């Protein structure tokens, strides 16, 4: 089993999901030979809550992780029923592959980036290039290929490969757009107006950083409206973190 975990990649911008430009030819070929989900929903969209749901099989409101800071970023404690190991490490997604007799390996810096060490539970091997999510695919893939060269012909392995390239910081190679110079833009192309609207909603991952608790200080981030005096101002502040706790 080869599982690609590509951070913040939109399905509707991939060829295998019908996007009009040839932006993901390699992944499209892999999709032809693998499993492609038509109806797969993310209950908690930010990076940390999303993977907590994927690993635990629970909504964030149940596993405890609904945000990126404070207690909202901590897995809920099991309590008095915990034995030598907790239920998360024994029953998480990757442990299911291991229980099935597969050798599990991960190439990811996610656990270090978010201090989410539970993410590594169930893996026989974990490889981290040490860039805390700032690495590009060129830094990860050589290690993946090396492992496959040494172990790929063996039976019963499960590999998790994590790429961060679509995530910030955006660093598309300068010559990349030239590949599509002769390809018409799709009808749903993200134009400058859409991008400007997106910038209005950019904020950090912690309520304290966006100055939510001090109405009298000039907001550091454009998303923060200062005082909330109308319903529309309140709607402007709502984001995916709120969705995770409703």
What are these model-predicted stretches?
Residues 1-246:
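Catalytic domains that recognize anionic headgroups
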């Amino acid at each position: 089993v080869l599982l690609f975990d590509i951070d913040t990649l939109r399905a509707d911008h991939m060829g295998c999901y019908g996007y009009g430009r040839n932006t993901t030819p390699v992944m499209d070929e892999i999709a032809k030979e693998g499993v492609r989900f038509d109806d797969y929903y993310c209950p908690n969209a930010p990076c940390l809550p999303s993977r907590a749901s994927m690993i635990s099989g629970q909504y964030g409101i149940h596993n405890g992780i609904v945000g990126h800071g404070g207690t909202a970023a901590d897995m809920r404690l099991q309590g008095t029923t915990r034995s030598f190991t907790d239920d998360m490490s024994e029953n998480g997604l990757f442990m299911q592959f291991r229980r099935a007799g597969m050798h599990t390996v991960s190439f990811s810096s996610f656990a270090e980036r978010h201090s989410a060490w539970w993410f590594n539970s169930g893996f026989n091997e974990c490889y981290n290039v040490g860039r805390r999510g700032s690495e590009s695919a060129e830094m990860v893939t050589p290690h993946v290929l090396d492992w496959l060269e040494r172990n790929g012909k063996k039976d019963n392995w499960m590999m998790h490969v994590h790429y961060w390239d679509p995530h910030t910081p955006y660093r598309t190679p300068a010559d990349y757009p030239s590949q599509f110079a002769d390809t018409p833009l799709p009808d749903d192309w993200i134009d400058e107006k859409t991008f400007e609207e997106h910038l209005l909603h950019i904020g950090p991952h912690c309520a304290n950083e966006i100055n939510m608790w001090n109405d009298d200080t000039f907001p550091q981030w454009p998303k923060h409206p200062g005082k909330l005096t109308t319903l529309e101002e309140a709607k402007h502040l709502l984001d995916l973190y709120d969705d995770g706790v409703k």
